[in-house]
Design a protein with these regions (language model features):
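Non-catalytic cap/lid and distal C-terminal segments of serine-dependent acyl enzymes
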Residues: 1-255
Length: 255
C-alpha cells in the first residue's frame, strides 16, 4: 500500500490497519522477481491497498522434496513457515476472507494445490495457465503429456511421492480433492485462466471445465483468443483475478 499524501507518516504507519494479502506464485525457471519485472503487479496492488507476497520456489512444483539435498519442503514452507512469518512481520490480516492466492504455470498448479488442500486459508484462488487432470487416467506413454507417468518431470514427482498409487492418493491429486470438496461448499472461489493458443493447457482446461459443469462446481473462466504461454496474457489475467477477488478499494496516489 502507498501512503496517501494527505496523511502524515504517523497517521499512516500507526493506523493499526490490517491489509489484505495476495500470495503470488511464479512458474518453472522463475523466481520471486518475475511478477515485478514482467507485469504491472506493483501498480495494481498499490491501487487496491493490497500486500503481495512473492516467494521463490525454484522448480519444486511447490511440493515437499524430503530426499532432495537437505530436504526441500516447499508445500509445507508456504503455509507453515512463510504465512505465519508474514503475519507477524507485516500489518496484514490472517483472516481467510482477506487472503488470496494466484500463480502462473507451475505456480498455477501450486495455486490450486494450496487452495484445495488448505481451503480454510484462502477466500479465492486464480489459476493461470494450468489445468487439473484426472490422475486415474495416468499411464506410461499417454499421448497427453500431463497424463504420461513416464514423462521425466512427472516421473520424478511420482517417485518422490513413493510410487504411482501414493501419488494418486496424495495432495497432488487436486482433481480428486475437488470432487470430494465440491459438494461441501468448503472450497475457495476458483478462477481459471488460459490463452487459446496455449494448446496443451487449454485442451486440458476444457476437459476440466466440462467436469466442473458435471459436478456442479461454479468457477470463473478467463479465456483470451490468440494468447499463448506468455507474460502479456498473465498481465491481463492477474488484473481480471484481482477484480474476481473483489479487490475494488481505491488506494494510494494516482501519480
Amino acid at each position: 500500500p502507498d501512503k496517501p499524501r494527505a496523511l502524515t507518516p504517523e497517521e499512516f504507519y500507526r493506523s493499526g490497519r490490517k491489509y489484505k494479502v495476495l500470495w503470488l506464485l511464479h512458474g518453472t525457471f522463475g523466481d520471486h522477481s518475475d511478477w515485478v519485472r514482467k507485469t504491472n503487479i506493483e501498480m495494481y496492488a498499490t491501487e487496491r491497498n493490497l500486500v503481495v507476497v512473492m516467494p521463490s520456489a525454484l522448480n519444486s512444483s511447490y511440493a515437499n522434496w524430503d530426499k532432495f539435498m537437505m530436504g526441500f519442503g516447499m508445500f509445507d514452507y508456504l503455509t507453515e513457515e512463510l504465512m505465519p512469518l508474514i503475519y507477524g512481520w507485516l500489518p496484514v490480516s490472517d483472516k481467510r476472507e482477506d487472503n488470496y492466492i494466484a500463480g502462473l504455470s507451475m505456480g498455477g498448479r501450486g495455486t490450486i494445490k494450496f487452495a484445495v488442500n488448505h481451503p480454510d486459508k484462502f477466500a479465492a484462488a486464480a489459476v493461470l495457465s494450468a489445468a487439473p487432470v484426472d490422475f486415474s487416467l495416468m499411464s506410461p506413454g499417454n499421448p497427453n503429456m500431463m497424463l504420461d507417468c513416464a514423462n521425466p518431470r512427472t516421473l520424478a514427482s511420482i517417485e518422490n511421492a513413493g510410487g504411482l498409487e501414493a501419488y494418486q492418493n496424495s495432495c497432488e491429486n487436486v482433481w480428486a480433492i475437488i470432487d470430494k470438496l465440491a459438494p461441501t461448499g468448503k472450497l475457495p472461489r476458483l478462477m481459471f485462466a488460459c490463452g487459446t493458443e496455449d494448446t496443451l493447457i487449454y485442451e486440458n482446461l476444457q476437459t476440466f471445465r466440462k467436469h466442473c459443469e458435471e459436478i456442479g462446481l461454479d468457477c470463473h473462466w478467463f479465456i483470451k483468443e490468440g494468447y499463448r504461454h506468455e507474460w502479456r496474457f498473465w498481465d491481463l489475467a492477474i488484473q481480471d483475478a484481482l477484480d474476481f477477488f473483489g479487490l475494488t478499494e481505491r488506494g494510494g496516489n494516482p501519480y
